[in-house]
């Protein structure tokens, strides 16, 4: 029987495509932290693969909601995102429509606060103080 060293599990894996890379690790209802700035540096192949796989009821945390037909806009169009945590959403008509009709839950967070929330969460820090949020719902 082969022994797998835990510190090496999952390292140096190459996948033929984004969909194969996501198999077995995505599920309905999960939270996705999506990188990039505006439409630059977004994981477009992974977003397309999520659409193809068909996971639903996702919470997406990103500095923006994409635009119609691009970025997270693709997952909004297919109704796969149920909640959006973002600092800017102004260029996506589908986002606006879903928000105004109550189909989409939205949480706005200043960009720096959003980045710190992601950093703190990744480090296991349950909360942090920021002067930006004093006196607000944040």
Predicted features by range, described:
Residues 1-138:
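Conserved alpha/beta enzyme-core scaffold
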């Amino acid at each position: 029987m082969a022994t797998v060293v835990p510190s090496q599990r999952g390292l140096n894996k190459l996948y033929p495509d984004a969909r194969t890379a996501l198999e077995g690790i995505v599920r309905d209802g999960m939270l996705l932290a999506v990188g990039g700035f505006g439409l630059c540096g977004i994981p477009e192949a992974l977003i397309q693969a999520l659409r193809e796989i068909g996971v639903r009821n996702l919470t997406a945390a990103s500095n923006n909601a994409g635009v119609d037909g691009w970025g997270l806009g693709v997952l909004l169009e297919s109704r796969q995102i149920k909640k959006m945590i973002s600092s800017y959403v102004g260029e996506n008509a589908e986002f606006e429509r879903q928000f105004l009709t109550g189909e989409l839950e939205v949480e706005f967070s200043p960009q720096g606060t959003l980045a710190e929330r992601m950093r703190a969460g990744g480090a296991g820090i349950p909360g942090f103080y920021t002067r930006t949020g004093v006196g607000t719902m944040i």
